Structure formats: structure tokens, C-alpha cells
């Protein structure tokens, strides 16, 4: 049975058709920047809601054409923390006829770990950096022993720092200071920031998920990205693989990734193209068993 899974993130809406935990086609993405302005207002803007609902509706139509028998839509930190998150969910239901599953921070962390570590047997940690939050999870053989959602993401950081490198560092340190994160040897990065950084290293001219998967991103590279970004480098010119919206925030994302490496003691992270979409599919399968 084919199942469509739609991930409503803070920066983008993603779509994939799943069948027995196998992605049948490349994931598709529409960058709607749902969390734009959320840092200042505490709510989702009307324009961002309209862009995102339209993207979800288009993917629901595509799911029907692709032969999906079920369509699942889940949302993360932007909808979870917005004062008008319920309004957004009602708009989606009215336009598409589907319910939005707004995940808790713990559920968001769990599905990211499930997706990224399906083939990993040793102890490892996974971090999922989005537009409005960063989840860090550690475990082994599918058993999680540490999980926390931190209120820092590349869009939220952009809005809060306003282009100031030192202010960005202060906000990152503040977000992580309240929690001691376990040290790890193996760290896996998922989400748009991680995969974009992987592409910048492995296929800078054109993004290719088959190439980025498994790429190792180290501290030195992250420091270079941060220096370029805040130094005024045209990131799209240097890295054509980046979309305009991603190029506008990649320096903030790299700064958060660097702090994650410092907090966990890891020297690098490995990019995974398996992420919360695969994890959510496994999550709902487990609930229905």
C-alpha cells in the first residue's frame, strides 16, 4: 500500500511516497518559510500560512495521482509554538481534508532518530536542525536514552540576530546552556541545513541526495562557511547547489551545527538523507500495529 507523507517544517514543506519503509521517489520540497517572522510576533503570518497551505494542497493532489491510499501530514516547531497554530491546522483541513498531526518536541526527536538510524547498530546521536528548533537524540538499536528539543533554528536565529554574528553566537549559547548533552563519537545530521552543508562539500554545483548521503562535515568546514556568510560572500555564487532561501540562512545553520559538535564532543557529523519522513512512516506503522 502506498502512503504519502507530508512534512510541514519551519522552512519548507516536503513530500514523499512510502511503501514498506522504502522511499519510492525522491523527496520533493517547496520552501515556504512558514516560520518567517515568528520570532518577533509569536504567530504565523497570513502570507506564510497561505503559501504553506497551497504547497500542502498541491502535494495532496500529487499524492492522489501517485496512487497513495493514505495521506499523512505532520508539523513541527513552527506550528507547535505559534499562538495561531490551531488556525493553521484548520486552514489545512478546510483546503485538503486532512488532519495535521502537530508533533511534540519529544515525538519530533523520536521520528528523526528512527529515520536516520534504521541501519545503524552502534550507539550514536542524531541532531535535526530545522528553521525553529534543533532536536538532539542519542540511543542504540532503536532505544533512545537522551532526547531534547532546543528552541533554536536557522530562521529563528536569523530573525533574532539580524545579521550580527556575535548576537547569533549569544542566542545559540543561550539556547543550549540549560541542558548537558551526552558526549558521543558518532553524530548524524538530518534536515535541510545538514543536507545543504553536505551538498556544499560533495556536490557544490548541483544538489544530489545520492551524493550528499554519508558526507562528513567537520568543524573546519563549518568555520569557513560561517566566515564566508558573515563576511558578505555571495553563497549562491560560491555554492550553486543552494536554493535562494537556504543561501540566506546557511551561515546561521552552520553556526548551530558547530555548537552541536562542541557540545557533543564530536569532530564531525555524517549527513543522512534518511530523516523524519522515513521516521514518521515507521512511527505511524508502530502505532497501528
Residue ranges with predicted function:
Residues 17-20, 37-68, 76-123, 138-289:
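Helical "lid/coupling" subdomains associated with nucleotide-phosphate turnover
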Residues 22-34, 66:
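N-terminal glycine-rich anion-binding loops that anchor highly charged ligand groups
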Residues 132-138:
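Acidic, divalent-metal-coordinating active-site segment for phosphoryl/phosphodiester hydrolysis
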Residues 10-12, 133, 272:
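Short linear Ser/Thr-Pro motifs
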Residues 10, 131, 192-195:
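Short, glycine/acidic-enriched loop or turn micro-motifs at the edges of active sites
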Residues 3-7, 124-128, 187:
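Short glycine-aspartate micro-motif
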Residues 4, 13, 71-72, 125, ...:
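Conserved beta-strand core positions
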Residues 1-24:
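N-terminal basic/disordered segments at the start of proteins
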Amino acid at each position: 500500500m502506498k502512503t504519502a507523507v507530508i512534512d510541514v517544517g519551519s522552512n519548507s514543506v516536503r513530500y514523499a511516497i512510502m511503501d514498506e519503509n522504502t522511499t519510492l521517489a525522491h523527496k520533493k520540497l517547496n520552501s515556504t518559510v512558514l516560520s518567517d517572522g515568528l520570532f518577533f510576533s509569536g504567530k504565523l503570518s497570513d502570507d506564510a500560512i497561505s503559501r504553506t497551505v497551497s504547497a500542502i494542497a498541491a502535494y495532496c493532489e500529487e499524492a492522489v495521482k501517485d496512487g497513495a491510499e493514505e495521506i499523512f501530514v505532520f508539523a513541527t516547531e513552527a506550528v507547535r509554538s505559534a499562538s495561531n497554530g490551531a488556525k493553521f491546522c484548520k486552514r489545512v483541513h478546510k483546503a485538503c481534508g486532512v488532519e495535521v498531526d502537530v508533533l511534540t518536541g519529544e515525538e519530533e526527536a523520536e521520528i528523526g532518530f528512527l529515520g536516520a538510524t534504521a541501519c545503524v547498530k552502534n550507539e550514536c546521536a542524531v541532531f535535526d536542525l530545522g528553521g525553529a528548533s534543533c532536536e538532539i537524540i542519542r540511543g542504540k538499536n532503536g532505544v533512545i536514552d537522551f532526547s531534547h528539543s532546543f528552541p533554536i533554528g536557522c530562521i529563528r536565529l536569523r530573525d533574532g540576530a539580524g545579521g550580527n554574528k556575535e548576537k547569533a553566537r549569544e542566542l545559540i549559547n543561550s539556547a543550549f546552556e540549560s541542558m548537558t548533552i551526552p558526549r558521543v563519537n558518532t553524530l548524524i545530521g538530518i534536515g535541510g541545513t545538514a543536507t545543504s552543508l553536505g551538498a556544499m562539500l560533495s556536490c557544490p554545483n548541483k544538489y544530489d541526495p545520492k551524493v550528499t548521503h554519508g558526507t562528513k562535515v567537520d568543524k573546519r568546514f563549518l568555520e569557513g562557511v560561517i566566515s564566508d556568510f558573515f563576511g558578505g560572500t555571495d553563497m549562491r555564487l560560491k555554492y550553486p547547489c543552494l536554493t535562494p532561501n537556504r543561501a540566506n540562512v546557511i551561515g546561521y545553520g552552520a553556526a548551530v551545527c558547530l555548537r552541536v559538535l562542541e557540545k557533543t564532543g564530536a569532530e564531525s557529523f555524517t549527513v543522512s538523507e534518511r530523516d523524519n519522513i522515513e521516521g514518521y512512516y515507521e512511527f505511524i506503522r508502530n502505532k497501528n500495529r
